[in-house]
Amino acid sequence: MILPARTPETSLLRVLFLGLSTLAAFSLAQMELHVPPGLNKLEAVEGEEVVLPAWYTMAREESSSHPWEAPFLIWFLEQEGKEPKQVLSYFKGSLSNKPGVTLVHSISTRNVSLRLDALQEGDSGTYRCSVNAYDSDGKNIGHSIKTIELKVLVPPAPPSCSFQGVPYVGTNVTLNCKSPRSKPTAQYQWERLAPSSQVFFGPALDTVRGSLKLTNISTAMSGVYVCKAQNRVGFAQCNVTLDVMTGSKAAVVAGAVVGTFVGLVLIAGLVLLYQRRSKTLEELANDIKEDAIAPRTLPWTKGSDTISKNGTLSSVTSARALRPPKAAPPRPGTFTPTPSVSSQALSSPRLPRTDGPPPQAVSLTPGGVSSSTLNRMGAVPVMVPAQSQAGSLV
């Protein structure tokens, strides 16, 4: 490659080119964002507000912007493990911002400070401010970026107090205190209120865990114990009452607890028994009931049957024997006996006695008809079982 010979004119052009390049680079780097020294890391309390201070300047120019200057401003929030998110942007009079995020000053003053209202713990992170300046022709005349780290502190939430162990004389009891939320982590302090005021220290007190160990307690250690959880931005407290019992008092309390437990068990048992009984009665009411077996009926004997029971003989006539035989029509004025059937044999009626010889007994059938008459009529004597007054056969 052949290089042209260096002449004074060529050297001058080279110097001019390098100078213009330097001026162009300086013009792009003439914008600068500023953050006050020591304010690039801020801390604020949850629920309050904070201002992230920042402004930009143009080299060798006044602090106020020119009419032809058009800044493009963006504030980002960067959090660990999350994508950056835009919280505010401004360009040519158009402002877009999240709720609770505003600019402190007008953009024409080149002050781009950011205000955050009603802070929450989730607002912690690194805020990045980016400013690009354009001229009236839309040419970029400067760009700068600054970051501010914000840490939102949380005062301790009200803690909860409790104790472990049975507080009677000679035993050990541990008092516990814990706040569910605190940033930074809360430190704990225990003290006993008047009339026997006392502040506790290690090794009985664990300021990180919030526990206080009381050993070989006595009745003099009874009282109200207060736990205070605190950090750099606030504190909260709770209390617990310790009533040290003697042996007899402890026995009474234990008996009351056991009695209560037994009573609850008995009540539960009665309720279950009542429910089971009600269920059983309901099932019985819904069952289909069968009728009782009817008593057996004895068949009537036929006219020709003869039954002897316990030596009792009775005479009955069957339906066949009761049929009158075919005979000549009765004479006028003659009585025709009608046979009757009875389930019991009737004794012959006794006639009044006279001085004459005793009358001969006449065997009559029930209804006043003699057996001889029935025999002439064709009746057949049969034996049937007799029936007692209770309805049973004899």
UniProtKB/Swiss-Prot annotation:
Pfam families: Ig_3 (PF13927), V-set (PF07686). Keywords: Cell adhesion, Cell junction, Cell membrane, Disulfide bond, Glycoprotein, Immunoglobulin domain, Intellectual disability, Membrane, Phosphoprotein, Repeat, Signal, Tight junction, Transmembrane, Transmembrane helix. GO terms for biological process: bicellular tight junction assembly; cell-cell adhesion; homophilic cell adhesion via plasma membrane adhesion molecules; protein localization; regulation of actin cytoskeleton organization; regulation of actin filament polymerization. SUPFAM superfamilies: Immunoglobulin. It is found in: Cell junction, Adherens junction; Cell junction, Tight junction; Cell membrane. The keyword Signal applies. The modification Phosphoserine is found at residues 304, 340, 343, 348. Residues 300-372 are annotated as: Disordered. The modification Phosphothreonine is found at residues 336, 338. Glycans are attached at residues 111, 172, 216, 239. Residues 1-29 form the signal peptide. The keyword Glycoprotein applies. The chain crosses the membrane at residues 252-272. Residues 37-146 form the Ig-like V-type domain. One of its GO terms (molecular function) is cell-cell adhesion mediator activity. It comes from the Eukaryota. Interacts with MAGI1. PANTHER family: ENDOTHELIAL CELL-SELECTIVE ADHESION MOLECULE. This is Endothelial cell-selective adhesion molecule. The gene is Esam.
